[in-house]
Regions:
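Catalytic core of pol beta-like nucleotidyltransferases
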Residues: 1-30, 38-40, 44, 55-140
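ATP/adenylate-binding site constellation spanning eukaryotic-like Ser/Thr protein kinases
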Residues: 47
Length: 140
């Protein structure tokens, strides 16, 4: 995706320390990089995709805003997308989990539980999605 500003030249280095920076967000239980941010080198006009899972006691809007603030400050760019996994659609969650790189994990048991449930739902959903797309667009 083309954005207005280039990523900082040291963004790769900043990505390596993003996990510890997310520790500041007390409501974030775990976080992932996904999409283009998981492959090196990032293109100058790329964005950084981050997914976080928030504790149930945290207001989802406030937790997302706090995570966005920490990520943008740490990376020194506004070219970020932060997804809250608690409310993300099944298709998006599954695609995030397929390319994820764990950058922060405050609760490994909760993360494994989330991943196993979300991937089961996603694989069930994909069967339905493929059938729907085949009916809609045909087989070729």
């Amino acid at each position: 995706m083309i954005h207005k500003t280039s990523l900082p030249k040291d963004v790769e280095e900043r990505l390596r320390s993003l996990g510890p920076a997310l520790r500041q967000c007390s409501g974030v239980l775990f976080g992932y990089l996904f999409g283009g941010a998981t492959v090196s080198p990032l293109k100058p006009l790329s964005d950084v995709d981050v997914a976080v899972y928030l504790d149930d006691s945290v207001n989802l809007v406030e937790g997302r805003l706090e995570a966005i603030g920490v990520v943008t400050t740490h990376l020194q760019t506004d070219e970020v997308d932060v997804v809250v996994l608690n409310t993300a659609p099944t298709a998006l969650t599954g695609r995030i989990l397929q390319t994820r790189r764990v950058i922060f994990d405050r609760d490994p048991f909760r993360r494994h539980l989330f991943e196993s449930r979300a991937l089961r739902e996603f694989f069930d959903f994909r069967i339905f999605e493929h059938r729907l797309l085949a009916r809609r667009y045909g087989n070729g």
